[in-house]
Amino acid sequence: MLDKIVILGAGESGCGTALLAKKQGWEVFVSDHATISKSARNTLDGLGIEWEEETHTLSKMKDAQYIMKSPGIPAKSPILQSLKSLDIPVISEIEFASKYTSATLIGITGSNGKTTTAMMTYKILNDAGYDVALAGNIGNSFAKEVAENKYQFYVLEISSFQLDYIVNFTSHIGVITNITPDHLDRYDGDFSAYLKSKMRINENQNMRDFLLFNGDDPELCRAVQNINTKATLHEFSSLKKNINTTYIENNSIVIETQKIKTMINTMEFPLKGRHNLLNAMAASTVAHLLDVSKETIRESLLNFKGAPHRLEPVLKIQNIHYINDSKATNVNAVYFALESMTAPTVWIVGGVDKGNDYQILYPLVREKVKAIICLGLDNQKIINAFEPITDIMLETQSMKEAVLVAKKIADKNDNVLLSPACASFDLFENYEDRGNQFKQAVREL
């Protein structure tokens, strides 16, 4: 009789796990409380995998050895509460997939910057000729890559929801880009619980491994000081200079380890903002620890185009710059976006609030924002936060309307910045849909 795994959710993570499990000889059952997409149904049918949609049948799960929970399913969902009584281990996709590869894993997590850092790291390693794949929250699922390929290195973008359900998973190089309040709706508003989840990137690391962390983040630094780890700690910081630190000096990224000091010139680096410099420092340090030359690192960074929906320049129309930062779904991401603005800015903000505290933005809004355009079904919290410090504040209910209003307000050489600070699912399918609608509305001006 085959060992059985039940997979909750038939999205990218669920289908990837189903593919890998089937290939490894497991009996697989996929259950999704929502409607399963046609492409996912075709994939599962092609593999001969039993599935169900719009329900969860507990009786079909009782004989499973493992439950793989897709990251989008909250821990408090009724099905997970029901499964507790069965005492079946619940694991994440990255936990399951890591059982079937001996590759070197680079795990990148954080509240902001993890996608850009993962993409930079992948580009540098790929440019250096490494046999590497980019997976996790970006690109294909990790499980699908393990099922279909045998790469020697994986750069994984990892969310806290995936780290919540690991047991033996470990990264040879773990990276934490920063920790700020985000997804607190999934952690009962408890920042310490969210922080604890992110710190699990260090779990199971040994003395041959490395934990890279943002030394400019005081909350993260305190958390790192409190962990008991055998891994080598290495911070990247725009402020500090020590051994086992990556820092900035004379327009260069300086990587100091116990053995060597390496300098990488950042002149002409295309991505702007302190946050992108920190992302580049993290990616450069990963590459350096894997013996990539500083010349290759610099060349890769100079040719890095940036991730979509992250301070993405769209168009300049009548000398007004339109910038798509739809991925900025929390206050910290918006802070870095506003910090990088060098001209008066019309700021489009709003969506589904995730427990935001906007006070950290007040100095930047006073200094850089000439008008705020609210885009969401419920904008009251944003209005209450910024009306006292903003001369112009307007509400809109569609992206097209928001962009048209922004065009009327903006003057020559101003910026129009979409940086929502909120989730997208009140008016849009996801942040990509929101960003794409912004770009389309700008093109139609």
Stretches found by the model and what they are:
Residues 27-33, 211-215, 348-349, 368-377:
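Short internal beta-strands
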Residues 4, 16-24, 263-370:
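Nucleotide phosphate-binding/pyrophosphate-handling subdomain across enzymes
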Residues 52-55, 91-95, 228-248, 298-302, ...:
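Beta-strand->loop->alpha-helix junctions that form or flank phosphate-binding loops
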Residues 1-92, 96, 384, 394:
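N-terminal leader/targeting and accessory segments in enzymes
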Residues 12, 74, 112-116, 277, ...:
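Residue-level detector of alpha-helix initiation sites
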Residues 20-23, 58-62, 71-215, 219-231, ...:
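Phosphate-binding loop of NTP-binding sites
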Residues 11, 34, 138, 216-217, ...:
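Residues in the short beta-alpha loop(s) of Rossmann-like NAD(P)-binding domains
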Residues 41-42, 359-414:
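C-terminal helical cap/extension that packs against the catalytic core
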